[in-house]
């Protein structure tokens, strides 16, 4: 059975792919657990760390609109792939940023990561809703639950990894985990072609 036919026969694969992506990309919801290690690693004052968070949130808001436009013009797979690239760029940028350059965190991490997570969200949400045309509330609930659980998951991840490998190690692990999940999810979304199904 081809992957396209598998998706057609098992529409739950769309929800699974979307939920897995959301679970790993809830950076705005989990910033609280990142803030203290980031302040220590990059020698940032609390105000500077708060600025990084504010820029992350602003980039997420702008990215939801831009991601929606991109999806309308190029399709959900394109939006998801761009989102993956931006998210990975932000995580790698934060991991590689010299400690003395902590002032650059909003530009190196917050903007690309905020845009990336936002590009992924509308692609996942709209495709899930269209595939579950008769059960939009259910589809939205699954994706929303994964987004909510993302904060708890990332909190556990950072609290486990940061004491051992530092916040840079946590950024690398998160990026390494998110890359295959987001790429596989984007491929699944692309194969689905957002057809109305259930």
Give each language-model segment a name.
Residues 37, 68-69, 160:
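Membrane-interface helix termini in secondary transporters
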Residues 38, 118-132, 139-140:
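Intracellular juxtamembrane helix-capping segments at the cytosolic ends
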Residues 23, 90, 102-119:
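Hydrophobic core of transmembrane alpha-helices in multi-pass small-molecule transporters
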Residues 29, 57-65, 152:
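Residue-level signature of mid-helix packing/kink "hotspots" within the transmembrane helices
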Residues 27, 112-124, 147-150:
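Core transmembrane helices of Major Facilitator Superfamily
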């Amino acid at each position: 059975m081809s992957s396209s036919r598998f998706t057609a026969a098992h529409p739950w694969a769309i929800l699974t792919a979307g939920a897995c992506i959301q679970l790993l990309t809830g950076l705005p919801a989990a910033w609280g657990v990142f803030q203290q290690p980031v302040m220590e690693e990059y020698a940032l004052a609390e105000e500077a760390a708060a600025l990084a968070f504010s820029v992350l949130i602003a980039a997420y808001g702008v990215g939801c609109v831009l991601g929606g436009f991109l999806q309308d013009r190029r399709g959900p797979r394109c939006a998801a792939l761009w989102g993956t690239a931006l998210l990975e760029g932000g995580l790698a940028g934060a991991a590689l940023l010299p400690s003395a350059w902590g002032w650059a965190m909003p530009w190196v991490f917050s903007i690309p990561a905020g845009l990336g997570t936002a590009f992924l969200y509308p692609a996942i949400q709209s495709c899930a809703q269209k595939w579950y045309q008769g059960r939009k509330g259910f589809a939205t609930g699954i994706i929303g639950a994964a987004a909510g659980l993302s904060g708890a998951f990332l909190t556990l991840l950072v609290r486990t990894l940061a004491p051992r490998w530092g916040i840079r190690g946590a950024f690398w692990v998160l990026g390494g985990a998110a890359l295959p999940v987001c790429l596989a999810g984007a491929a699944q979304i692309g194969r689905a072609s957002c057809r109305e199904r259930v």
